[in-house]
Amino acid sequence: MSKKVGMISLGCPKNQVDGEIMLSKLADNGFEITNDVDGADVVIVNTCGFIEDAKKEAIENILDMVELKKEGVIRKIVVTGCLAERYRDEVLSEIPEVDAVVGIGSNSDICEVCEKVCSGEENIKTFGEKTCLPLDGKRMLTTPSYYAYIKIGEGCSNNCTYCAIPSIRGKYRSRTPESILEEAKTLADGGVKELIVVAQDTTRYGEDLFGKCALPALLTSLSKIEGLEWIRVLYLYPERLSDEIIDTFANNDKIVNYMDIPIQHCNSDILRRMNRRGSKEELTALITKIREKIPDVVLRTTLITGFPGETEEQFSELSEFVKEMKFDRLGCFAYSQEEGTPAAEFPDQVDEEIRKKRGEIIMEQQYNIFEKLNHDNIGKTMRCVVEGYDGYTDSYYGRTWRDAPDIDGSVSFTCGYELNEGDFVDVEIFDVNEYDLIGEVI
């Protein structure tokens, strides 16, 4: 009888892709993949370990599995992902009920590890060189069938002083265009209509292979794949967002005019101490240029409040910048003092409560901005993907092209004929409900 394996995948889409590759390898090697961990022979907790909140979530999930193991509901626990890589020794020593810890560079050993724990081996640790996984064969998608993430690179070479990712996942390494395009075609042939391009920094793609950014050429090639309706790009580093990249967005109908540009801050001194380049003036010029070239662009950004040494004046500068720029989408995180990062040793650490309060202020501001921008959508017709049907309200729900999965809003709409999950329809917006839109198919 084949062994049952379940997975709990946490964190970002990049980690989710790693999990999908592991699931595919397990299935190809005779394991039965189950969505319900109850009764599983092995539960893999694919963790994030990027910031404190992510670590807490990962540990809570591991401890939940420990309880199930004690109750006899599951047999074995394997921990993978960033937490496993970053705290390889601590996981087994602090949580001895864990049977195996698999580092990012050893994900391809997942089948062997699961075989070993099922046969009774304990305290397994396996780690290897931090490289891209071989992506031969299909992935077992954990997303709905109509969209998928595609990872074009691994690791990061930006070395922001607050970030542990380079130490966890290594320097930036691009996949070859041939590998990416082959995978994208396989996904499209399997019914994927929205392809979401991810890496720690998508604007760095190709620099290590060709000596220059190859993202525009890659996106152009992806747009020629039959069956893809939308190509969405996340994690665009602002200082490398060139005119060529902007023009590629502006001139290609398949690439949705949605730019995810994490700026983190606008104050020049804070950016310098973050080891990020640019200034408020340069960021303003970039955003202005993007909006001039792509009038209907949706801009998403991410900010950090309470970085070491951030004064009230510097925070006020950030607050005013947010009001002035009016980002369409914005996420704000209180600075997390991560051990092993340069910023963790900086003097003038900001009190944790102040960090959080500043983040709350930014998000309150952004809500007011978003509410106004959302009302501006009333009367517009937008292309949407159908994600499901709500019998309680007798309406469908989905996303507009302006919204990425999981992190942005949704739209509910009625239709005079039956729709299926993954269909693309034009919806006229006639009302809003906080972050979400309401409309009808035309």
Can you say where each PLM-predicted feature lies in the sequence?
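Radical SAM enzyme [4Fe-4S]-AdoMet core and its adjacent flexible, acidic
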Residues: 12, 206-227, 273-277, 337-368
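Generic beta-strand/beta-sheet core signal
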Residues: 8, 80, 198-200, 234-236, ...
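Terminal RNA-binding accessory module
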Residues: 345-442
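Conserved SAM/AdoMet-binding glycine-rich loop
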Residues: 77-81, 86, 189-315
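Proteins enriched for Cys/Gly/acidic motifs involved in redox and nucleic-acid/cofactor modification
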Residues: 1-205, 244, 259, 281-292, ...
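Conserved beta-strand core positions
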Residues: 5, 42-43, 148, 195, ...
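Conserved, mostly hydrophobic/aromatic
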Residues: 160, 180, 197, 233, ...
